[in-house]
């Protein structure tokens, strides 16, 4: 009987110990029904939201500043549209077409499909350098002024130089009294177009009725 009593006493002691440990673990949970928040490490900056007791929001990610677009880019004394692509913006220069603009972009190592207004100044300077020396960067058969009258050189004119050269050529044709020069003097079409209905110059002649017709119309009105 003594052995049985010893065993029962040991079981009771173990049961009491387990109850004590369980009560000790459940003690912090009973206070307020929430676990206590862990204390921040010493020296760490405390969050304002944590001080107030609310949930803090994540700080917004810093937005990268976007490059400002230049709406007007000046190249070769011409204001170009900065919202267009490079290959189309360069065609705004008189004397430069689509094909030459693509060649200029390739020679300057600039993306022809990039927006002109977003190009850095270094790439814009490269475009200017290629345009200033087009004779070396463009095939001879693409130049717009081959075998110049005065110098005999192959050139590519653009901008104001092109307009002045065209005016000088017309003045030369007028001085030598060529057919084209005479047509330019008279303000008529130069390239053989018909002028029966279009291209007429001078004052328009109105329709004039004859005196007899006017008198007959007046008599008819009197009879009525």
UniProtKB/Swiss-Prot annotation:
Residue spans of biased composition, Basic and acidic residues class: 1-17, 210-224
UniProt cross-references to InterPro entries, sorted A to Z: Rbsml_uS13_C (IPR027437), Ribosomal_uS13 (IPR001892), Ribosomal_uS13-like_H2TH (IPR010979), Ribosomal_uS13_archaeal (IPR019977), Ribosomal_uS13_CS (IPR018269)
Biased composition (Low complexity): 20-30, 38-47
Recorded family membership: Belongs to the universal ribosomal protein uS13 family.
A single cellular component GO annotation: cytosol
One of the record's GO molecular function terms: structural constituent of ribosome
GO BP term, pick one: translation
UniProt xrefs under HAMAP family: Ribosomal_uS13
Region (Disordered): 1-64, 184-224
Keyword rRNA-binding among UniProt keywords: yes
Function recorded in the entry: Located at the top of the head of the 30S subunit, it contacts several helices of the 16S rRNA. In the 70S ribosome it contacts the 23S rRNA (bridge B1a) and protein L5 of the 50S subunit (bridge B1b), connecting the 2 subunits; these bridges are implicated in subunit movement.
Protein name according to UniProt: Small ribosomal subunit protein uS13
UniProt feature coiled coil, ranges: none
NCBIfam families tied to this protein: PRK04053.1 (NF003140), uS13_arch (TIGR03629)
Pfam families: Ribosomal_S13
Oligomer and partners: Part of the 30S ribosomal subunit. Forms a loose heterodimer with protein S19. Forms two bridges to the 50S subunit in the 70S ribosome.
Source organism, top-level taxon: Archaea
Presence of the UniProt keyword Heme in the record: no
Keywords on record: Ribonucleoprotein, Ribosomal protein, RNA-binding, rRNA-binding
């Amino acid at each position: 009987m003594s052995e049985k009593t010893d065993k029962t006493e040991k079981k009771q002691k173990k049961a009491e110990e387990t109850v004590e440990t369980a009560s000790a673990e459940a003690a912090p949970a009973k206070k307020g029904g929430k676990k206590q928040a862990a204390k921040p490490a010493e020296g760490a900056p405390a969050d304002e939201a944590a001080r107030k007791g609310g949930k803090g929001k994540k700080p917004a990610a810093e937005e990268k500043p976007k490059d400002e677009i230049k709406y007007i880019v000046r190249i070769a004394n011409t204001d170009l549209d900065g919202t267009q692509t490079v290959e189309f913006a360069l065609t705004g220069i008189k004397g430069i077409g689509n094909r030459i603009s693509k060649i200029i972009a390739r020679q300057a190592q600039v993306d022809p499909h990039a927006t002109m207004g977003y190009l850095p100044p270094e790439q814009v300077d490269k475009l200017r350098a290629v345009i200033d020396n087009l004779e070396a960067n463009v095939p001879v058969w693409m130049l717009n002024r081959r075998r110049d009258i005065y110098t005999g050189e192959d050139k590519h004119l653009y901008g104001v130089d092109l307009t002045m050269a065209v005016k000088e050529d017309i003045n030369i044709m007028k001085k030598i009294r060529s057919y084209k020069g005479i047509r330019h003097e008279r303000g008529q079409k130069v390239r053989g177009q018909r002028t029966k209905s279009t291209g007429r110059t001078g004052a328009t002649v109105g329709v004039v009725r004859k005196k007899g017709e006017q008198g007959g119309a007046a008599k008819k009105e009197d009879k009525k």
